[in-house]
From Swiss-Prot:
Its main location: secreted. Keywords: Amidation, Cleavage on pair of basic residues, Digestion, Hormone, Neuropeptide, Secreted, Signal. Belongs to the NPY family. It comes from Drosophila pseudoobscura pseudoobscura. Residues 1-29 form the signal peptide. One of its GO terms (biological process) is larval feeding behavior. This is Neuropeptide F. Residues 30-32, 66-102 form a propeptide. It is found in: Secreted. The modification Phenylalanine amide is found at residue 62. Disulfide bonds: none annotated. An integral part of the sensory system that mediates food signaling, providing the neural basis for the regulation of food response; coordinates larval foraging and social behavior changes during development. May have a hormonal role in females.
Length: 102
C-alpha cells in the first residue's frame, strides 16, 4: 500500500470515529425540561425519558455501605492489630545471644 493511500485510510478512520462519537452524544442528550406538564401521562413520559438518560450514567458505588464482607474484614483487621500490640507490648519476643549484639 502506498503512503498516500495509507494517509487517506487513517484520515477516513479518524473522521468516522469522530462522526460516530458525535452521533452518540446527540442521541443521548438530556430531555428538555418542560414546564407544561399538565397530565399524568406527560409527567410519566418525562420521568421515563429522565430514567433512560440517567440510567446508563449512574454508577454503582461498591464499598459505600457496610455489608457482611466489610464487617468481616474490619473485624479481622482489628484482631490482627490487637495481636501485634500484645506481642510488642514492651516484652522481649526472643532472647538475643551475645554474638548477635553489635
Amino acid at each position: 500500500m502506498s503512503n498516500t493511500m495509507r494517509c487517506i485510510l487513517i484520515v477516513c478512520v479518524a473522521l468516522t470515529l469522530i462522526a460516530a462519537g458525535c452521533n452518540v452524544e446527540a442521541s443521548n442528550s438530556r430531555p428538555p425540561r418542560k414546564n407544561d406538564v399538565n397530565t399524568m401521562a406527560d409527567a410519566y413520559k418525562f420521568l421515563q425519558d429522565l430514567d433512560t438518560y440517567y440510567g446508563d450514567r449512574a454508577r454503582v458505588r461498591f464499598g459505600k455501605r457496610g455489608g457482611p464482607l466489610m464487617e468481616m474484614l474490619r473485624n479481622r483487621e482489628l484482631e490482627n492489630n490487637m495481636a501485634k500490640s500484645i506481642n510488642s507490648g514492651g516484652e522481649l519476643i526472643r532472647a538475643l545471644d551475645e554474638e548477635e549484639v553489635f
